[in-house]
């Protein structure tokens, strides 16, 4: 590949470390959980919006529901495109400015309100949620709110609020989760007054219809330029920008996701967000809050799955009674309902913590994204199984033969991307693990440095002993061993005691892993993934219990029902946690790695005999690209034309 950038593992790691937020200026519930502490006071009482904010949100949702009643999701699915009038309606409601401050023409709504909007629009069609989320969570508004200048906010935020759609351009044909390989460049020109962008960006959600782009590109280091991956706001109709492809996917049939070529695109220096070299840090910081949109979207679909499962399992009769009364199906319904309660709790808690700003939520947001994506996919799969052949059949086909057009197979297809979007589950586990072991890495020093010599490791060991001499004894005994602890939670107190005990057990096991593998721990991705999954389940149990207690306090009748749901969820989650603890040290990780290496070396190719692979000869695994002008037609189009006065017009 002509533009492939070669980097070593060490260079890639260094860039990742340089780009992450290293300080912890605010408390973090999840960080403490991984360290063996259970600071319940950080999440209890369950935070909630003010009465005024709640009333404002409800009023907006009423208007949104009225509009969505006129939107037909099947039209989007069949056409694989969102009709212009649907986008116009969302813009007129202010949906593109939900999180933009009112001084820039936005609605200045909370993260909680924003997520409730995403839940609702997603249940009409997931592409609507993707459109709004990509625009506001990772598009131009969020990076500018975090790192933009006053002038940048004045120039661009009113347009975004009015419906000028934005997109985020980071991924490249050969660059996914490893941005150190980024090949797109931003070369200073005009005596430093501008930059010239060159490159190709892949999977540009909203990129086909965007007015504004956030583009990540590498600035060469030179005199007067610190260089590095940098972020720019770019007008999508700038000369040299070509949308060469509109991609098609398994799900999200209406998503406007493409391939964008940039050739000699001139960008004024005033459009640089932050400093040169800050682009990746800005992107990661943006994602800390931006990731909360995906749990909301996943939860919206899971709620829809619960409704379908309930109604169908009463209606469908087999062997003399409704299928929902058969234990095999009842267990699935229980899982769907209990998991829905926890999904709701995790989304609400994380979002309200983001709104309050009292806590560092980088781990909570990442856990919410990881756990919600995984669990919602399981919910969708169980629903499909409950529906049987009708679950596998399309809504259009069901309707054609006179049955209710239930889009279960579409829901499953649409949910699947959440385990890949904005950090795959595998990458999320590694990112969270890095934060979870941060205190250990700080204490260990050169013990965790693969390049350190024996003298350096010996010195580091002496320093680490002080930290662990104070920390380890605190993991022996805790409040979770006292039978009366958390008794204000009634029947749920036992689950909070389980979380407290498990938190200390998790911390001890993390330490054992550090002691056993030291600098090699980062390569033990199976172990680290299980550590993170345990933390995610403990976070979800905590959120469910605290939310149930808040509901009981506010409304005893609803609270009793919430307790029932939370009880079922906690018991299910406890079984998963115990299995994960067992798997930390009893697993097939080593044999899996050995077998995978043998597979990659071609040892078992005889297993592949007797098949036809019709993809052979259709193209390379990864498309190459060369810098230069595009030879393709520009597929860019606009939903809306937003004037300088920020009025949205077709």
From Swiss-Prot:
Lineage of the species this protein comes from: Bacteria, Bacillati, Actinomycetota, Actinomycetes, Mycobacteriales
Keyword line: FAD, Flavoprotein, Oxidoreductase
GO biological process: fatty acid beta-oxidation using acyl-CoA dehydrogenase
GO molecular function list: acyl-CoA dehydrogenase activity; flavin adenine dinucleotide binding
Stretch list, region Disordered: 1-23
Protein name: Probable acyl-CoA dehydrogenase FadE10
Any Pfam family the entry gives: Acyl-CoA_dh_M
InterPro entries in the cross-refs: Acyl-CoA_dehydrogenase (IPR050741), Acyl-CoA_Oxase/DH_mid-dom (IPR006091), Acyl-CoA_Oxase/DH_mid-dom_sf (IPR046373), AcylCo_DH-like_C (IPR036250), AcylCo_DH/oxidase_C (IPR009075), AcylCoA_DH/ox_N (IPR013786), AcylCoA_DH/ox_N_sf (IPR037069), AcylCoA_DH/oxidase_NM_dom_sf (IPR009100)
Positions of the catalytic residues: 422 (proton acceptor)
């Amino acid at each position: 590949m002509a533009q492939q950038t070669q980097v070593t593992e060490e260079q890639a790691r260094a860039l990742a470390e340089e780009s992450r937020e290293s300080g912890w200026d605010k408390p973090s519930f999840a960080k403490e959980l991984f360290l063996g502490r259970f600071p319940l006071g950080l999440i209890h009482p369950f935070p909630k919006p003010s009465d005024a904010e709640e009333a404002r949100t409800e009023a907006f949702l009423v208007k949104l529901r009225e509009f969505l009643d006129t939107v037909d999701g099947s039209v989007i699915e069949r056409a694989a495109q969102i009709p212009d009038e649907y986008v116009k309606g969302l813009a007129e409601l202010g949906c593109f400015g939900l999180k933009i401050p009112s001084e820039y023409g936005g609605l200045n709504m909370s993260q909680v309100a924003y997520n409730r909007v995403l839940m609702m629009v997603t249940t009409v069609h997931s592409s609507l949620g993707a459109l709004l989320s990509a625009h506001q969570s990772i598009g131009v508004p969020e990076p500018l709110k975090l790192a933009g200048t006053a002038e940048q906010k004045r120039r661009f935020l009113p347009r975004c609020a009015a419906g000028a759609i934005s997109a985020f351009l980071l991924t490249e044909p050969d660059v996914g989760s490893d941005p150190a390989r980024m090949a797109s460049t931003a070369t200073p020109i005009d005596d430093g007054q501008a930059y010239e962008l060159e490159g190709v960006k892949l999977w540009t959600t909203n990129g086909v219809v965007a007015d504004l782009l956030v583009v990540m590109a590498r600035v060469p280091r030179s005199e007067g330029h610190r260089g590095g991956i940098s972020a720019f706001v770019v007008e999508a109709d700038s000369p040299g920008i070509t949308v060469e492809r509109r991609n098609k996917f398994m799900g999200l049939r209406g998503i406007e996701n493409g391939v964008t070529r940039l050739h000699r695109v001139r960008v004024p220096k005033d459009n640089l967000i932050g400093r040169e070299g800050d682009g990746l840090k800005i992107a990661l910081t943006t994602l800390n809050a931006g990731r909360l949109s995906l749990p909301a979207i996943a939860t919206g679909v899971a709620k829809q799955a619960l409704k379908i499962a309930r109604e169908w399992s009463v209606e469908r009769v087999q062997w003399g009674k409704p299928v929902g009364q058969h234990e095999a199906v009842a267990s699935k319904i229980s899982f769907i309902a209990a998991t829905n309660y926890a999904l709701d709790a995790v989304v609400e808690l994380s979002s309200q913590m983001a709104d309050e700003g009292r806590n560092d939520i980088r781990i909570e947001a990442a856990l919410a994204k990881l756990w919600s994506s995984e669990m919602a996919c399981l919910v969708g799969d169980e629903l499909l199984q409950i529906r049987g052949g009708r679950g596998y059949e399309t809504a259009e086909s069901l309707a054609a033969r006179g049955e209710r057009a239930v889009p279960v197979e579409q829901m499953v297809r649409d949910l699947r991307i959440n385990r890949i979007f904005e950090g795959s589950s595998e990458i999320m586990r590694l990112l969270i693990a890095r934060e979870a072991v941060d205190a250990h890495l700080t204490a260990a020093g050169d013990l965790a440095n693969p390049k350190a010599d024996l003298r350096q490791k010996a010195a580091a060991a002496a320093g680490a002993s002080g930290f662990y001499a104070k920390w380890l004894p605190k993991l022996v005994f805790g409040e979770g061993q006292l039978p009366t602890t958390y008794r204000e939670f009634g029947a749920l107190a036992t689950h909070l005691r389980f979380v407290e005990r498990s938190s200390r057990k998790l911390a001890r096991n993390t330490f054992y892993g550090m002691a056993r593998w030291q600098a090699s721990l980062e390569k033990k991705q199976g172990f680290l993934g299980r550590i993170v999954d345990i933390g995610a389940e403990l976070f979800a149990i905590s959120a469910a219990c605290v939310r149930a207690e808040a509901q009981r306090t506010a409304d005893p009748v609803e609270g009793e029902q919430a307790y029932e749901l939370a009880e079922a969820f906690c018991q299910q989650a406890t079984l998963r946690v115990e299995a994960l603890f067992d798997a930390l040290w009893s697993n097939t990780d080593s044999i899996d790695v050995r077998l995978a290496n043998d597979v990659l070396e071609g040892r078992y190719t005889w297993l592949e005999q007797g098949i036809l692979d019709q993809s052979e000869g259709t193209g390379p695994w990864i498309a190459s690209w060369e810098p230069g002008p595009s030879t393709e037609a520009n597929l860019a189009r606009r939903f809306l034309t937003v004037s300088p006065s920020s009025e949205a017009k077709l």
